[in-house]
Structures are given as structure tokens and as C-alpha cells.
UniProtKB/Swiss-Prot annotation:
Its main location: plastid. Its cofactor is Zn(2+). InterPro entries: DNA-dir_RpoC2_beta_pp, RNA_pol_beta''_euk, RNA_pol_Rpb1_3_sf, RNA_pol_Rpb1_4, RNA_pol_Rpb1_5, Rpb1_funnel_sf. Zn(2+) binds at C224, C295, C302, C305. Its EC number is 2.7.7.6. It comes from Atropa belladonna. This is DNA-directed RNA polymerase subunit beta''. It catalyses: RNA(n) + a ribonucleoside 5'-triphosphate = RNA(n+1) + diphosphate. Keywords: Chloroplast, DNA-directed RNA polymerase, Metal-binding, Nucleotidyltransferase, Plastid, Transcription, Transferase, Zinc. Binds 1 Zn(2+) ion per subunit. Pfam families: RNA_pol_Rpb1_4, RNA_pol_Rpb1_5. GO terms for molecular function: DNA binding; DNA-directed RNA polymerase activity; zinc ion binding.
Amino acid sequence: MEVLMAERANLVFHNKAIDGTAMKRLISRLIEHFGMAYTSHILDQVKTLGFQQATATSISLGIDDLLTIPSKGWLVQDAEQQSLILEKHHHYGNVHAVEKLRQSIEIWYATSEYLRQEMNPNFRMTDPFNPVHIMSFSGARGNASQVHQLVGMRGLMSDPQGQMIDLPIQSNLREGLSLTEYIISCYGARKGVVDTAVRTSDAGYLTRRLVEVVQHIVVRRTDCGTARGISVSPRNGMMPERIFSQTLIGRVLADDIYMGPRCIATRNQDIGIGLVNRFITFRAQPISIRTPFTCRSTSWICRLCYGRSPTHGDLVELGEAVGIIAGQSIGEPGTQLTLRTFHTGGVFTGGTAEHVRAPSNGKIKFNEDLVHPTRTRHGHPAFLCSIDLYVTIESEDILHNVNIPPKSLLLVQNDQYVESEQVIAEIRAGISTLNFKEKVRKHIYSDSDGEMHWSTDVYHAPEFTYGNVHLLPKTSHLWILLGGPCKSSLVYLSIHKDQDQMNAHSLSGKQRYTSNLSVTNDQARQKLFSSGFSGKKEDRIPDYSDLNRIICTGQYNLVYSPILHENSDLLSKRRRNKFIIPLHSIQELENELMPCSGISIEIPVNGIFRRNSILAYFDDPRYRRKSSGIIKYGTIETHSVIKKEDLIEYRGVKEFRPKYQMKVDRFFFIPEEVHILPGSSSIMVRNNSIVGVDTQITLNLRSRVGGLVRVERKKKRIELKIFSGDIHFPGETDKISRHTGLLIPPGTGKINSKESKKVKKWIYVQRITPSKKKFFVLVRPVVTYEITDGINFETLFPPDPLQERDNVQLRIVNYILYGNGKPIRGISDTSIQLVRTCLVLNWNQDKKSSSCEEARASFVEIRTNGLIRHFLRINLVKSPISYIGKRNDPSGSGLLSDNGSDCTNINPFSSIYSYSKAKIQQSLNQPQGTIHTLLNRNKECQSLIILSSANCSRMGTLKYHSVIKDSIKKDPLIPIRNSLGPLGTCLPIENFYSSYRLITHNQILVTNYLQLDNLKQTFQVIKFKYYLMDENGKIFNPDPCRNIILNPFNLNWYFLHHNYCEETSKIISLGQFICENVCIAKNGPPLKSGQVILVQVDSIVIRSAKPYLATPGATVHGHYGETLYEGDTLVTFIYEKSRSGDITQGLPKVEQVLEVRSIDSISMNLEKRVEGWNKCITRILGIPWGFLIGAELTIAQSRISLVNKIQQVYRSQGVQIHNRHIEIIVRQITSKVLVSEDGMSNVFSPGELIGLLRAERMGRALEEAICYRVVLLGITRASLNTQSFISEASFQETARVLAKAALRGRIDWLKGLKENVVLGGVIPVGTGFKGLVHPSKQHNNIPLETKKKNLFEGEMRDILFHHRKLFDSCLSKKFHDIPEQSFIGFNDS
């Protein structure tokens, strides 16, 4: 009793509120001092005391007790103001979505936190005995967070996936929620019955799987005699002391520990609190402890490796089922924590960074060499300092020095004036915070339909070389040029192949139009690869892509012009078939291009023509048929224009396709009705029967014509043809009837001897034999077509006063689209074109242009008198490799670029102004004779312009050239910008009726070079017009009075009128992307964001576009110039966010780690590093034992990191689990190796999973290396790969496990608990444990001192030390010369 009194005198007197944690500590100390019985008595007294006091207090709660905080109104208003500014920045493209999300979360989080801190003082001042206040701080039910929701604001919520919803709930529960807020609350609350039930069952299942893995682990021996341990060091400062002591208490030392010469702890001594404190104060060397990892056996564990039992504080007893305890200790917090969710109700919690503020007003100075610019996580510009930075602030009378720690962000510039208390730097939150970060992908979706552009180079992700996933190397904008994609109904989708003609009204459908990629894409690519740029001229294919074409259909001109996705060069070009169709209404149809006819001008996208290629074709409406049929040329000789059928079958540069050109002027069309039916359909008519018009053929099909029915059954379908015509049963003497398939001209022979009748029209005779003896002749009507010379294409190109077409010849060719005797199928009421008239382009082989193999053509649109005219320009090109230009250029305008004047990229659109034939000859000989060629530095291009004659007149002043030449030489005022861009000039000359705007594509963009004084005497200079024309020959030429419909791109034009002054023209270049709110004129209105496509003297036209900011490392989906739809994924950001403090995010993470499901993307080179390292170990350690040691090192490293990962999740929840429980589980999932195929060992079959120790023993016995590699099994797989098949079968897949066990003849030794429970035996633990403890051999321990701090290196040292005996047998002398330290530390290098 006296002893007890003495101990009582030593006890501490607590005079403070005791919460749950303090209570836990108190109970554990009571148990240590007094034991269990006495403690339970004390706790009873505490319980009684608590209930008495609560009854006496009798707190009640009413709605009036909820007092709201007065300062809430203006705080919320302030936060809303900030969010509004942020939204604007995002709209302008200054911050991207992730930065916006982060910042808005932080704004609202700070507001909410401030309100929470206000809450307490507010209650204290107004009403200290408020029941809400008392309850929330009693620690009983409810906490500050809940009270904050009642009287402050609910704040931000997370959705079921744990992502933040960036719409905060501004009301509290006292004021009541709006509808939106209520719905968001329903997301966040997550205390729905279903939700909790599902989570509880998840946690329960996790526990079951965990127990399944480790149920057989029992303490069987006192000491397994291992010499290994894991070293733990207090020194490196990374591990907080609390965690350090937690790791050590209750463990057993694996090594003696020396403090200088003095030994302060011996091997196999268990560690208590006193010893830990001694270690911490002495800062001893790394302490080597025994853990379940180091125990020698995998099927049981020894007392010393396990350590103290957590229940009573002594070494664990023999026969204790530590495996099941471990499984349940890890699973149990899961079940508890799922029920915890509704405390916070899903309210988001996060951390804010610390700030450094300026001590006084003054100018700030720092060394700029020590910082480098970066973006903060909110997208603001800042400086990052890598080492300590001293910042001085000079105020009027005093210098302040502020030290900024490394890795901080400096938010001010050098020499900037700061005010007192202004934030000048932000310190990154330290590593000590427990809630750790996770990587999250965020997809950004497009808000509108449009065309995608980006303003920087992109990389291809290595695994998607051909895909459309690109990595951004630097911060840049992605632009979506607005417009609606071409819509087409499904009917047309089936009919229109790529390149077919379409009427304008067919674009009115609702479906998305997807053009069919041609099958021959790959062949074309192979052909390109095979021929490459070799010397064979005839083999080289300049480009393959779709063709431009203009189709004049009534009111509209449709220009099909696909957008190419160009990678760096021609060979890797991949085609995306996209259309852009500008529709221009033409008012003067009668003297415009051919009125209302279907002339199609075909221009390849790159505009390159070969000789004899088809320039335009015309589909004559006279040669159109609605019905199916067969084309016959009769006996007339035909020949194919190109004999090789497969020369160029893909859609690229169209030379003559293998069509058939007639030598004569007529061909015949034999109509027939064809139905192609699926093989399963039931037909209501018989073969060779005769039907009338509108006869039922199948259930939903009626015949359109009457006649003879022929049914052919093919593999999977039935072809049913109906031939109209007369049937004759001829006599034997008839000669004609013996032939079949003849065309008979009018006025010849007798059809039947009885009725001698002259044939009035052409007929087609076909012999039909229904049976062997009978036959009859079918006489079918024939439609005859005469082929005229075709239309005169001179109407398309009117007579030319400039007579420039000396060099280029056009000839007209008719060809028939179908071969002789080929059947023609019509599909659902479309007309079939039989004959096509072509315009073939050719040019002379004169000496100067003898190298010209190809011409380049493009459309020129010229507005004359308010009308839009199309002109076709054909340039003869010399250089064979001139069009391999990259699409991305430095100036960001997205046009063709070449840097400087390099000759391989000859710009195709340099054009020559010329006004008479003499001048033309002169200009062709001396290209520098005109203003354009003077500006164009490449002298090798010749080009011709085909101008309409309507507005041309002859002009013969020589003075004109010289004046310009001289003035350009001497006038220094011309601003020449060395950036690329298209250029349009307006050249008014007095004799001209009206002004021309010709589009050129020069290397130099000259803004206002015509305002020269000398010119003003001769010419009257009007205003400029600039055009945007990209290298595909697309021209945007808007009429400023109204919107032009670009279908598929309804361009949202935006017109800006302002006084166009000189400095403005320098700011704006064509094709430039402009962010919203950038002011271009001094007092002009702010712009909307978009791409500049027209610049005039007093206005510019901008095509609306939406910018999206993307930071480095983001992946861009889709190709440059691709059409995107609303809701398509544009960019994926990968960013880190701190996990919210809710276990619902934690439990799945634990499960992911234990089931070994990888979520992080591991960089490629990491693997290679580790592989190389393993190889070098194998080399050092000699072959036979290399596998063993490599495997053990890998296992050691992965075990430690797995334990840390799982502990992190639980610690972040404030749950304490002892490491050894996790270690027992991790040991089970890492103790298997997979036998690999390399070594043909006779013991194990390849692919078999065996225990590491078993492989090691077997290798020793066989004295040969068994090849295996380490695998991490998930807990489910580990449960299905145990020693006992009964235990496996009772877990999952019973039938499969039992069948396999039977086939293999497995034996179950009934060592674990579960097998015995299933069979009803005594379980081998506790009293059922037959304690045959072998006296463990004491090894002579050689203490090893190491200088390394890393856990992993310590473990590695032990492995190497453990296998010292192995080295001696298999290593040469040289190895012993290497000091031990060098091969312990070889992973440092």
C-alpha cells in the first residue's frame, strides 16, 4: 500500500479539458502503472462522473442559439469579386482551367477559414454560454466544422470522386440553401444509406482478403537466428521524431549499438521508451532492427522478429496468431473510417501557402542571377529562387533585409516599389504536412465547334507516334477558330464518297458529316516511301491529298478544300479529310462563269499539277441516268487512256484516270432494274418469270418496270434484275437468235421469220436459256447517246487581252466513266453521270522551262464593283522539293514559313504584274522588273496570272517600271518586316476601270510601301486591302457589308472600324491571333479574341476564336487544323492536388497499394536505370547467386516503400497502425518469385510462382542458377497462391482451385488456421500449438558499422553480409581488394 501511495504522489495532476487523445494516453499510462483490473475500476468512476455532470448541465438547443457572423456579407462579396476577375483572365486565355480551379478553390477556402476563425471570438463576446458553442468545443458530438456549417458558410464541396466542385455554397444551414446549393450539398453530404453500406461492405471485404493472405502466420519459434535487419536512422531529419519513436518502440535490435567504445544496447534486446530517448539524444549511428521482413521463414514468424505484443507490452507469446491480428488491425480502421464521412459532410479542406510581407514601403532590390522566371500555380508570373535569397528594401531612412528561403516564389520584380505589408514572396508549404499530394488528370473540353490551331511546336508522345496525342514543350495558346462543321444527313453519308459532287441543299441534314477516308491511303504512303525522292522523275509523286474544286450550282460556288495535317515533311504526312466550303452568292450569273452548270475545277490542295493532268471537268446533264443499266460501245474499238490500271488510283494528283476515251461519237445505255437483296430475304417472284409494273417482289419492294425477272444468288446476297423488252420464241432457221449480247443498228435484219419487221431504233438482243432444250430471245430497248465536242471551255476562260496563255495549253477530252459492258448501279434515286468532259492542262517544253514538270494552281478571288470573281492562276514551278514546308512558324500566324531566304522553300505564290506581251517577255527574262519580284528574293519562280478580260486594258508605259524601281532603291521609308505573311495590294492605275486586288504570297510582308512621293504624280493611290490566304489556296475574302456563310465554318466575323494609323499596321499582321482586350489603336475599342483575316485602312476583320492556355507537359488531343465539335477533349493537364481530408479517398488508395494496381505513370528511363543497375550487380556478384541477390534487393526496396505508402494513407487520417502489422501483410505479397524462361532448370516449370526462400534453397542444392524475377502479387492473387489448396478453395474460384489441385496432385499439410477450421480440426495456435521449440543456434555476430543513412542501403548491406559465404565460393581474388564501402554504395553513382 505504501508503494502505491508513493507512486500516487508521483502522478501528475491534470487541470485541463481532456479530449479523446488525452484519454487514450491516460488509459495506456494507467495500464502501465497499475495493470488491467485497477484501470477498469478507475474508468468506471470517470464514466459515472461524466454522466452526472451532463445531467446536471442539461443543455438544450434551439434555432435561436445559432448566431450568424456579422462580417460574412462583405467577405463573400469580396471573394465573388476576385472570382469574377479570375473568370475574365481565363476567358482572355491568361490562365488555364486548372489554375483557375486552384485559385478559386483557394479564394473560397480562405474566405471560409476566415469565417471559421471569426466564429469562436464572436461567440465568446456575444454569448459565452451558448449551447452551440459549448457543444462544439466539448469534443463530444459535433465539431467546429459542423458548427461552422450551421452559422458560417458551408464552403466548397467535393463530388463523389473526391474532385472539387468549384461552385461554393455561400449560405449556411441557418439561412437555408438555394436549389443549386442544395443539390451540390447532396453530392457532398454522402451520408446516404446506400453510400455508407457500400463503403462498409468494401472495407469488410478488404479485411477478409487481408486475413486470407496471412491467416497461416503464427509465432512458432523464439529465434530464427537471422543476422539481417533494417537500419533506421534518426539523423537525416526526414523522419519526424514521433514517427521515429513509433517505428522503434516494441522492436528487437538486430545488432549491438555502440556509442564510441561503449556498448549502449545489445543484440536481441527489445526497445522501450527509455532506449529510444537515449538514441534520440545521443544521435547514434543507424539502428538495425529486426522486422517480420528479416525473419527466415515465410510460413511462420519468430518471437524476436515480431517484437512486443501490442496488447500487454511483453515479447509476443509462442503460438499467437499474429497474421490474423495484423489483417484485422489494417482492415478495422477502414470500417470505422467509412462511417466517419458525415462528420465533415464532404466539405473540402485544403492548405494555403505562407506569405512573406514587406516590412515597410520602399524599393525592392535582389540579385536577378539567382532567380529564374516561372508561373505560380495560379498562373501569375513570378521568380523561383533555388537558394537562399536576400532581398533589400530601401525606404527613405532605413534598409530592410528580408531572407527568402529556397524553393520560394518571388512575386515582385527588381526595383519595384512595394508598400508596407504587401506580399512579396510565397513560401512553398513544407513537406511536414501530412495530407500528401496525388496526381490528377483534368480534361479540358471544347466549348464550341471549330477548327484547331496552336501557336507552338508540339512533340509526339513516344508511345503514340502516329496518334493524335501531342505533348506541349512550352506554355502556349490553343485556338479554336469558331464555326459549325458541315452537316449532312445519313442518306448522303452512304452515297457520297470522298470527292463526290454535292449539291448545296444536301448539306442541310442534321448528322455530322464524316468523309470516308480512301482505302488507298496506305498504298500511297508505301509508294511514297519506296520511291522517295530518288532520281526517277516519272515515279515521284509530288503530294497526295484531296482536290480543291469549285462547283457552280446555281447560286453558290462551293470550294472544297481539305485541311492537311502536315508533320515535318512529306513522308509522314497523314491525311485528315476535312472540308471548308465558302459559299459566295454571285449576282451577275449571266456574264459570270458558266451559268448554272456543273463545271468543277479540280485543284490539288498543294496545287501541283503534272503534265496532262485534268484541270477541270464538266458533267453534262444530258448524260445523266436515274436507273441502273449496262453501257455498251458495241463493236467499236475503244482504248484506255492509261493502260496501267493501278498507276495512280488513290486520290491525289489526278492524271488521266484509267477511263475509256471514245474514238467515235456515240455509246449505248441498256437500262435494267437491279435490286440487291440480303441472302435471307424471301422473294415473291420466280426466276425467268415475267412481271408487270409495280409487282410485289419482296415484302417492302415493288418493281418499277415490267419485264423478265432474273435471279442470281451470290454468296451472301441475291441480285434480282428485271429486263424490260420483248420476248421472241425464234424458229430454228433464225440466225440472229444464236448470238447473244448483240447490238443491232436500226434498219437491219428480221427478228422473226413470221413478222419481217424493220428495226426502227437500236436494239440489244440477249439469248436466255431457262432449260437445256428451250431458249428464247429477249430484245431490249437501248438508249443511244451521241457525244458532242463538249462545251467550249473558252467560256470559262474568256479571251485574254494579255495573251499570256502561250505557255499553257488546255485541251478538251471526253471520257466515259464506265467500262464497256460494265453494269452500273444507281443507289436510291441518285442520278448516274455517264460521260465527263475534261479540260486537260499541258504546257510547252521550251528551253527555259524545260525543267518544269509540274504547275501550281490556285484560286484568286477578286472583288470588282462589289462582286466577287474567281480567277484561276497557274504557276509553272521549277524546284522539285519546294513544298515541304512546316506548318508551324515562329510568328504564330499559322502560315507557311521558311526562315530567311533558303532556296528549297520556294514560295509558290510570287506573282508578276505585267501589262503587255512585251512586258511579259521582259519580265520573264528579267524577273526583277516589277515590284513583286524585286521583293521576292527567289529568282527561280516564274508565274503567270490568268486575269479576266473584263477589267483589263492594255497599258504601255515604260516609265512605270523605272519609277518604281528607282523609288524603291532610294526611299528608305519602306518598313520591311521579315516575317511571313500573305500580302495583297491594291494597284490602282488611271486607265483601269476599277482596282484589282491580287493575292500574292511573299516572303516579306510589306505594310505600306506604296505611299511613295514619286508615285503620287503618276498614280492616284487608294487604300490597301490585305487578304489571308493559306498555302492550301483557301481564300477568305469577306464582303464587309454582311457575314459570309462558310459552311462548315459559319465564321463569326467581327468588324472593327478605327482610324488606321501607321503604328497600328505595325502591330497587326495578317493571320495573327489576338487575345481579347488587347488594344491595338490608341483610342480604339477593345478587340474580341480571334485571327486577323482582313486588314483595311480603317478597319480589320477578325475571325472569332477562343484561346485556351496550355502549360508544358499538357497533352493536346487532335491534329493541327482539325475540325472539333463541342464537347471534344482538347487538352489533358496532369496536376498535383492535395488530397482532401476524407478517408473515402484513403481507403481505395490502400486497396490499390495492396492489390498492386499501378496508378502512377512511371517514366521510361527509370526502368532502364534499374535494369542496368541490376545487371551490374549480377556482374559484380558472379553468376550463380546473381538472381538471388538481385531479387532480394528489389524485394527489400519495394517492401519498404509499400509500407510507407500504406502508412501515409492511414496517418493522413490520424489513424495509428503499428508498422509490423503492415509488414506482415507486405511480406506475404512480396515473397514470391516468378520462374522465367531463360534458365532451363529441371525443377520448376517456367511461369511458376514459388517462394523466394524455396528458390534459394533449391538453387543451393542443385548448385546451378535458377532464373527468376520478383513479382508483386496483389492480396487477392497471393491468397490464391498459398501452400494450402483448401484455404484457396474456400476463398474464391472453388471449382477451379480444386480441379487444378487434383490435376497436380497437390498435398495440403494443414499448417494454417483456415484449413483446419474447414476440416474441423484443432487450429495450430494458442493451446493447440505444439510448442516444439528448437533451441536456436546462436550465430557469432560480427557488428558492422556503416555510415549510410538510407533504409534501403542498410537492408542491402545486410543482404550482402548475409551472403558473404557465397561470395567466397564464386568470386575471384580481385573482388576482395574492393573495400566493402564501395559495393555498398554503388547505387549512389
